[in-house]
Amino acid sequence: MANNYTDHPELKFELNHPLMKRIVELKERDFRDKDSYDYAPLDFEDAMDSYDRVLDITGEIAGTTIADNAEGVDLEGPHHEGDRVRYASGTADNLDAMVKAGLNGMTMPRRYGGLNFPITPYTMCAELVAASDAGFGNIWSLQDCIETLYEFGNEDQHSRFIPRICAGETMSMDLTEPDAGSDLQSVMLKATYSEEEGCWLLNGVKRFITNGDANLHLVLARSEEGTTDGRGLSMFIYDKNSGGVNVRRIENKLGIHGSPTCELVYKNAHAELCGDRKLGLIKYVMALMNGARLGIAAQSVGISQAAYNEGLAYASDREQFGKAIINFPAVYDMLALMKAKLDAGRALLYQCARYVDIYKALDDIARERKLTPEERKEQKNFSKLADSLTPLAKGMNSEYCNQNTYDAIQIHGGSGFMMDYPIQRYYRDARITSIYEGTTQLQVVAAIRYVTNGSYLAQAREFEQAEVSEAMKPLVARAKAMADKLEEATARVKEAGDAAFHDICARHLVEMAADVIMLHLLIHNATANAELFEKSARVYANFSEAEVAKHHTFVMNLRPEDLADYVQA
């Protein structure tokens, strides 16, 4: 029986990272729930066993029920009936299976019906689901919107809404509008407080809303009359039970067919404020988007894993010229690079997730008591690390999953262009990952300051001092040379003092930094488990070294005056 977790031991390796000790310690707070909830862990080992068992259950559901339904869901898609959405029959079955297994509200405290899981094992579950059906993964993983409500909502909102998500109700985040895509400060959905109704009334249109007919919505709307920028925006909670939001249409998309992407019309929809006015975009949506970007990184890794599996299986079975095509260098070169990108991207994803876990757990503790000076320092450090790695994890993994599905189709040859193999679905589903929740270009905008302020370089230099196996020492030397090139290229861009030159070089610098960090992470993994990661570390070293050299050449040879050649009239 297929199991997306146990079939891929790389996940259990990431789960057992040494930082999990600190994460569990912070999350469970001396295991204080053990006397109140029979499913609360007694100690660290018990907590880790619980994560492992839930991942096993999720992997089994993903590898059987969700995988078996995926093709039918892709063909059927959701239905627009009146002003509402009806999921494809397979999607409804998938949701039912996940709810019955208790896989909702995973990161929420037990007092609300959650599992109190860290972000890391929850993110792994999101990867497992996406590997079978990325569209369904969107619906299920939008439960993590509840993190934002938990962080910024009040206790009354916590007690009313969080248990519903833990019980299996669905969520959406309603941000985008026809004239406000990447530029969210242009959002114009109007929020007006009604003294008569005793609530806020929302009016306007939202577009490209994933799972738009969800039970609970987090909505970005303009609450301040006469404003046109981000400071006039607030966040609201809309409950579908209140009425006032209709689905105008479901978009006809290239991929993720099971996920209903909706245009919504708000007509005096009753809503309540989440947090404080004017902080909707500049604080709450930024937190919401960071969580979503980690989720898309997990989705991308899941799709990459599925693409690699399909390519490997086809290459092993398909014979040409008297032997399986996997034996031809042109094919095993592609497969090896797919696996290296998969392993490197996954390492980056879970390094980021662990950093998020530590600072978020400390944030939560700070709501109960004052942090010690040591805890405040730890919180600040891991928050900065998480902020720096989030755009890399989302940007690089979404690009890698597009590349890996492309190569998997290439391995299939003409058969890959037919609709008979699942790889065509993975290819279509992958395309959106580098677009939604911030395009790759916007991830570069978020990441470039960590290049120019030296944060990524400092992380690389710290990695260079780590103990590694003898087999990996030559790779550390190569990674150091790559970091030297990053340092030189960064200095050149900063010295130029030209904004447009800085912007056109930004992606090159960010990818250089990502290549260096991911190589170090693979070196670390290969030191701990050579059997799982040594091949990928060597392959990725060859690939990333060439990539860094390419980007370095571009940046060092380009001049600010050359930008005139790039401007398209």
Model region roles, listed by residue range:
Residues 454, 466-569:
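C-terminal amphipathic alpha-helical interaction region
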Residues 59-60, 90-163, 167, 210-212, ...:
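Internal helix-loop-helix
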Residues 199, 203-245:
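A short core secondary-structure module
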Residues 343-394, 490-504, 523-531:
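C-terminal helix-coil-helix/basic helical segment that borders enzyme active sites and/or dimer interfaces
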Residues 35, 39, 241-244, 248, ...:
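A glycine-rich, basic-preceded beta-loop-alpha segment at the flavin cofactor/substrate interface
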Residues 154-160, 439, 445-487:
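A structural-propensity feature for long, helix-poor, extended segments
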Residues 1-81:
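Extended, charge-enriched "interface" segments that sit outside catalytic cores
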Residues 2-5, 10, 17-19, 256, ...:
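Alpha-helix capping/hinge segments and adjacent helical runs
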